[in-house]
């Protein structure tokens, strides 16, 4: 039962089974992500969940796993949508990765000269290049905290479906719960997307170090 599972995990008297995330905890988190990351309209099936000790740890595991499984190799081309959480800038520069990074900047302006923190179509179209194997994005952005516009989201979806179907998307949606009716790219492109979500920001519990 749920209470038995939680009691054993608090006591820590044995290894967790399954080791990636506890059974009943996974069911709860699946529903939570469907509500908060998919605006209550999740894709068919279920997400493969892995509990981690915080969002930053999840990032490190993702980079490592992508390379160890030969999905990304040293020197491969990736795209980075900026502004972005700082480690996404620093990790690709490490010697073991040395990725060829294409930066896509949120520098779209209004006619009045105000910053919208959104992306130009011609910059998003860089993702059509099949040499770009992965796209890293913080959505909503960090620190501006603006979610991708509907138009940009649809453009990325069309690029994946029509131009670069093997593009891997790594989206860090930690602040998604602060956006009304937020819908992650993992809800739109579940077979291409790896999502990092941390509970710490929304629940004000950064010291807990809990994420999926």
Regions found by a protein language model. Give the residues of each.
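Active-site PLP attachment segment
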Residues: 188-212
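Residue-level marker for buried hydrophobic side chains located in beta-strands
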Residues: 169-170
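Conserved core of the PLP fold type I
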Residues: 4-164, 176-190, 194
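Walker B catalytic acidic pair
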Residues: 173
């Amino acid at each position: 039962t749920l209470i038995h599972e939680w009691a054993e995990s608090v006591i820590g008297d044995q290894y967790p089974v399954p080791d990636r995330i506890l059974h009943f905890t996974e069911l709860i988190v699946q529903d939570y992500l469907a509500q908060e990351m998919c605006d209550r309209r999740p894709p068919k099936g279920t997400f493969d969940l892995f509990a981690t000790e915080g969002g930053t740890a999840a990032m490190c595991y993702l980079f490592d796993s992508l390379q160890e499984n030969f999905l990304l190799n040293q020197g491969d081309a990736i795209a980075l949508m900026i502004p972005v959480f700082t480690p996404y800038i620093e990790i690709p520069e490490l010697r073991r990765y040395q990725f060829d990074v294409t930066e896509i900047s949120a520098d779209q302006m209004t006619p009045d000269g105000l910053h919208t923190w959104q992306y130009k179509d011609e910059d998003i179209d860089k993702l059509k290049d099949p040499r770009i194997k992965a796209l890293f994005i913080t959505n909503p952005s960090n620190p501006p905290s603006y979610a991708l516009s509907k138009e940009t989201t649809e453009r990325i979806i069309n690029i994946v479906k029509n131009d670069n179907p093997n593009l891997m998307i790594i989206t860090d949606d930690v602040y998604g719960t602060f956006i009304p009716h937020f819908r992650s790219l993992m809800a739109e492109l579940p077979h291409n997307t790896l999502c990092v979500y941390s509970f710490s920001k929304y629940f004000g519990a950064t010291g807990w170090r809990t994420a999926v």
